[in-house]
Amino acid sequence: MSKFTKRILAGISALLIAFGGIVALDEQTDSASALNGNMFDPGLIVSDSVFYDFGTMTVDEIQRFLDSKVPVCKANDGGPTCLRHYKMDTQAKAGEAGRCDPLPAKKDVSAAQIIFDVANACKINPRVLMVVLQKEQGLIQASNPTAYMYRAALGYGCPDSKPEICGKGSTITGLFNQLYRGAGQLQWYGDPRGSFTYLKVGTNISVKYYPDDNRSVKCGSKTFMLKSQATAALYYYTPYTPNEAAL
């Protein structure tokens, strides 16, 4: 199994755990052992009521969850520390209609506080944000993270196929910018005023098994009924799904 497939499956497993009630979010259960392919419904990865429930966790609860995933941080000298210990200054955000509310500038802010602040500003469940952080760069469970993992934390504007476009100093890079912009995009995907309306709940949609159309071997796609706007938002953000063999 490729690293790419393993990472996608890890993200799907995390989604099932966080949203499907298979195990509690703060349990020390191994996600791979908890995942059963028969449980995965590509048309209902998460309900709207869960996805947009931004008040599910306090800062302390988020911090305890991060602590539980990396009991021992093994960051290299000169490299970034683990997410549980990570702190940074955050700049003020003016907010944008249909995406996120304004946020003030802060000094020396923990990752848990950033996740909490962004979840409340953008009205997205903090569990969703943590799942996407794990799916995109593996930050939740990274004991020795790289600078790039923070630069492209939520994968916003940083496609796997072109990592070079996710440059230093950009207004979209870094943990805070990635969370704020990425969460805002997830919120915008559910706004009927936006341009992302082609995946319609209650209709059959076709989603590819692999995002790159330029591969020499085509991987095909799966057709299924879309059952929630939140699931549509996830497919807009990450437009592929695992096949049965991968599950």
Predicted regions and their residues:
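Sec/Tat-exported extracytoplasmic proteins
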Residues: 119-122, 136-143, 183-193
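Non-catalytic cell-wall polysaccharide-engagement segments
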Residues: 33-72, 157-247
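Hydrophobic core
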Residues: 13-21
